[in-house]
Structure formats: C-alpha cells, structure tokens
Amino acid sequence: MFSPADNIFIILITGEFIIGILGNGYIGLVNWIDWIKKKKISTIDCILTNLVISRICLISVMVVNGIVIVLYPDVYTKTKLQIVICTFWTFANYLNMWFTACLNVFYSLKVANSSHPLFLWLKRKIDMVVRWILLGCFAISLLVSLIIATVLSHDYRFHAIAKHKRNVTEMFHVSKMPYFEPLTLFNLLAIVPFIVSLMSFFLLVRSLWRHTKQIKLYATGGRDPSTEAHVRAIKTMTLLIFFFFLYYITSLLVXFSYLITNYKLAMAFGEIVAILYPSGHSLILIILNNKLRQASVRMLTCRKIACVT
C-alpha cells in the first residue's frame, strides 16, 4: 500500500504526464499537418517539432524514473536498470536543453538587429545555421549519453556493497555514490545551453533598447511592427528561460538528493517540479504562437458546433 504522500505524488506526476504528452503532441501534430499541406516545413516549425519530440521522450523517461525511484527504490538498485534510465534520461535531457537553446538563438537572429558582420551573416543564413545547430545538438546529446552509458557500465562497485545491505534506504544511498561524479559533472555541463539562451535573450533586449532609443527621435506615437516583434519574442524567451532555470535547478536537486536526509521527499519534489518545464511550457508555446493558438481555436469551435448539431 502506498502512503498518502505517495498517492499525491502519483496524482501530480500522472497529471503532468498527460498535460505534457497532449500539449507537445498537439504542437507536433499541427506542424506535421502543416508540413503535409505545404510540402515543406519552416525553420521555426522544424525547431519546435524536434523540441516537442525530445520533450515527449524526456517526460516519459522522467515519469518512469520518478515512479521507480520514489515508489520502488529497491528495484532501482539493479545495475542494468539504472544504466538504461540514466542513459536515456541524459540523451533526452541534453536534446531538450540544446533544442531549447536553438529556439532562443532563432528568436534572437530573427528579431534582433545588429551591425556586427558575424550576426548579419548568421541572420542571412539562418535556415542553414539552424539546421546545422539541430544536427550538432543531436550529435552532442548522443555522444554524452554514450559516455554516460560507458562510464556507468564499467562501475559495478555499488552492487557488491548494496547486496550486503538489508535496509532499502541504505541500498539506495550506497547505489547512488558511484553515479555522483559522472552524472553530477554532466548535469553541471548542461549549464552551457542555458548560458547560450541567456546570451540570446540579452542580445534581444539590447536590440529592443537600441531600437526604442531610435524611435524616440522620430516620435511616431505607438509601437511599430519591429517593436511588437521584439516584445513578443522577449515575452516568449522570458517564460522559456524561467522554466529552463527552474528545470536546471530541480535537476541538480534530484542529482544531489541522496545527500539529503529525507531523500524520498526531495526526489519526489524535484521530479514534480522538473516535469513542469517540458509539460507546462508546451501550453505557453501554444498560447503565444499564432498558428498553434489559431489551430486550437478552430478545433474547439468545430467541436462546439459538432456538439450543438
């Protein structure tokens, strides 16, 4: 029997899983239908499609990891299961973070203005640059996950120690120790895409500040299309970076949870908050993206008409 706290954890993580799968699945479906109709896919749709696929994978791995680690910690002490979960989580996690950084870079290149030669070249070649970045993101994520799998598969010391322990909690604490160095290192390295996102955000803010300063000289009265585009992009990136930061911090909490006395509570809290990022941000993308929002409105309108008739 599960405790009341376990039942609350199951309800919350199940709700986040459903929201995340439906939200990200909807984005992918809309982009896929648009791709079929137009026989081509835009750069932003390409980024979003790759992003939501990585998030669906990440949410699935995180839910499985959370349920096993919180509700069945004795099962998690098995070496092969830990290696499989950690490898897939690392791959999906890095894909998600780098695709998110790629989305921020796209917003920055598309909307911001700068006279720097490198920026102008990247802006002209934005479609080619983004596709190479996406390919690079996949290569980096695959390489890191393979390194994690190799490192963990060669470290079986915890199994020999854990099998002499009778207490499940002690087994869990012992089993996490060999994973501390590689997983913590790669969790800390994941700050690189976050820094890339921050740089893109500040470049966009700087561009808006300079653009607003120039507009004041002409006193046109009202915001021009460029200003509106800057504001929309900054709103989107602000929410994205907030969720990104929250996810990164809670991922570290999960990685260091074995150091906390009540590790089970820390792990459950970390998993629930971390899943908010890939699940909740999909809803924000739907609201802020004109095409996705209009498609959802049309779908709801058609459903309402069908119900009436």
Swiss-Prot record:
Glycans are attached at N167. It comes from the Eukaryota. The keyword Membrane applies. SUPFAM superfamilies: Family A G protein-coupled receptor-like. It is found in: Membrane. Belongs to the G-protein coupled receptor T2R family. This is Taste receptor type 2 member 8. It comes from Papio hamadryas (Hamadryas baboon). The gene is TAS2R8.
